[in-house]
């Protein structure tokens, strides 16, 4: 077999076949359009004819649309997915009792065929990825010998639980000796299913904002991340569920042990992911537990809940600091004297130059706010190189603002509750920006680099709930029409994306 590079396409030839063109992509495009037509028919039946609520139609719609996005944005088509696959593969080795490598450093055992496919696929979307998906998925693995490869560990940033769904999919594929492409796709399907179930539970638990949660769980960027090996599927799902539980506790002060245990677990999870940037969301706990106490509660007992909250907050902050201390120490120790123009901003710079830091934050908001909003609504797919038309994204934004005001599902907050929600979102937003400033941005830049809209998805349920207003009221019939409009726009996003690829 000889390999030659012609333009940007790889041509592989042997005595029996030749491929190097993308003519098969035309058939893929036609098939995708037919599938989208079936999707529109299904949603029209469920939403318009049957008049189903979001609790009833979310799972089939999210699963159907998620699988479409999984085929559209193929393996390695999501930012940093190769790293996520390796982390999930490491966990899969433990599930299958594969011994650790004896080489010092970050190395793992991997099936030779899986390693070869990983090396073959590029980061992003290109015709070879679709060729492998269409013609080499339903095969058995040809070479399952384990070889040692190096990988980048993410254990310092997230707990292993975020890779459990993908690791289960990888383990199933390896046990059944499935092809590398199908094995990777199984990992992505497991991640998608777990995310859909988490959002479904959030929708069922939330006393209000069910339509908002469902719409956020169907945004293109949300489904792209959910239908991949990225840890975003579990992180977004857990924080959506956490927000729903907080709203439930605010609306229904009666204690339910299972919900309290879930809140405790999710609060701990939030404290130990992504450097603690979502830690301010724990203010939602303070909001729901600082509710007016029961009138028959003894006065001394009324102090127990606030005291427990304060102690818990201190413990969670301590856990965050301990978990990420090596990373924080490295950021503090950055030497800016050697080459300040090519050195990343250290944490000490933020404290030593507060006015300059505020200036950088302001510049970031002015220069990058449209890009961030575009990314949040799903306008920058794959490795940020699939740009969706703004006209479609504006419709998504209008739909979110309307669905948060559906009659009987509109969030009702006191001024105190709105203040808690606003400060929790603002705090997380600032921490995300600061983390990218001291972890990615070089000192020759006057704005923060690397911020993506998907980083703010966990804040979206709480943030968009603040836009509930008595000036807008959407009845059920109109909400069904709004939902069907969203399904049509989702289909148009897929069509635009695939036309940009072929």
Residue ranges and their predicted role:
Residues 245-255, 278-313:
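Perimembrane helix-loop-helix junctions
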Residues 40-44, 182-208:
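Transmembrane-helix motifs of polytopic, lipid-linked glycan transferases
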Residues 95-186:
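Interfacial juxtamembrane loops and adjacent helix segments
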Residues 228-235:
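Short acidic/glycine- and proline-prone juxtamembrane loop motifs at membrane-interface regions
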Residues 53, 178-181, 200-220:
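Transmembrane-helix signature of polytopic, membrane-embedded enzymes
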Residues 25, 141, 318-407:
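Membrane-lumen/periplasm interface segments of multi-pass, membrane-embedded glycan/lipid transferases
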Residues 1-12:
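Single conserved hydrophobic/aromatic residue that forms the stacking wall/gate
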Residues 224, 259-275, 280-286:
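Membrane-interface alpha helices of multi-pass inner-membrane proteins
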């Amino acid at each position: 077999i000889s390999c030659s590079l012609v333009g940007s396409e790889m041509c592989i030839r042997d005595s029996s076949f030749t491929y190097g063109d993308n003519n098969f992509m035309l058939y893929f495009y036609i098939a995708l359009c037919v599938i989208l037509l079936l999707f529109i028919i299904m949603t029209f039946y469920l939403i318009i004819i049957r008049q189903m609520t979001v609790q009833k139609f979310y799972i089939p719609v999210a699963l159907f649309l998620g699988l479409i996005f999984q085929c559209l944005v193929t393996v390695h088509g999501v930012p940093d997915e190769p790293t996520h696959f390796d982390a999930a593969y490491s966990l899969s080795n433990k599930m299958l009792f594969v011994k650790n490598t004896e080489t010092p450093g970050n190395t793992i055992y991997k099936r030779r065929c899986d390693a070869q496919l990983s090396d073959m696929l590029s980061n992003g979307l290109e015709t070879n990825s679709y060729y492998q998906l269409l013609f080499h998925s339903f095969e058995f693995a040809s070479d399952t010998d384990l070889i040692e490869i190096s990988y980048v560990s993410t254990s310092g940033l997230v707990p292993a639980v975020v890779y459990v769904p993908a690791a289960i999919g990888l383990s199933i594929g390896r046990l059944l000796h499935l092809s590398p492409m199908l094995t990777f796709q199984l990992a992505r399907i497991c991640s998608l299913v777990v995310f859909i179930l988490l959002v479904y539970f959030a929708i069922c638990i939330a006393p209000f904002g069910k339509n908002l949660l469902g719409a956020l769980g169907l945004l293109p960027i949300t489904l792209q991340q959910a239908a991949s090996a990225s840890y975003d599927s579990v992180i977004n799902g857990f924080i959506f569920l956490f927000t729903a539980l907080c709203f439930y506790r605010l609306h229904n002060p009666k204690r339910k042990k299972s919900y309290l245990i879930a809140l405790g677990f999710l609060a701990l999870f939030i404290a130990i992911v992504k450097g603690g940037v979502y830690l301010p969301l724990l203010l939602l706990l303070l909001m729901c537990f600082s509710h007016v106490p029961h009138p028959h509660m003894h006065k001394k007992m009324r102090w127990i809940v606030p005291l427990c909250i304060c102690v818990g907050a201190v413990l969670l902050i301590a856990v965050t600091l301990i978990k990420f201390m090596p990373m924080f120490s490295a950021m503090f120790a950055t030497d800016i004297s050697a080459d300040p123009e090519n050195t990343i901003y250290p944490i000490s710079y933020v404290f030593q130059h507060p006015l300059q830091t505020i200036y950088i934050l302001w510049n970031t908001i002015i220069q990058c706010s449209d890009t961030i909003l575009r990314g949040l609504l799903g306008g920058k797919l794959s490795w940020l190189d699939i740009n969706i038309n703004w006209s479609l994204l504006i419709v998504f934004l209008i739909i979110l603002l309307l669905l948060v005001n559906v009659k009987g599902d509109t969030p009702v907050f006191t001024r105190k509750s709105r203040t808690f929600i606003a400060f929790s979102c603002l705090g997380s937003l600032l921490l995300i920006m600061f983390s990218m400033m001291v972890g990615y941005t070089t000192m020759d830049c006057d704005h923060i680099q690397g911020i993506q809209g998907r980083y703010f998805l966990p804040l979206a349920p709480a943030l968009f709930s603040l836009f509930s207003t008595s000036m807008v009221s959407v009845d059920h019939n109109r909400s069904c029409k709004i939902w069907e409009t969203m399904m049509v726009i989702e289909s148009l996003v897929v069509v635009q994306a695939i036309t940009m690829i072929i």
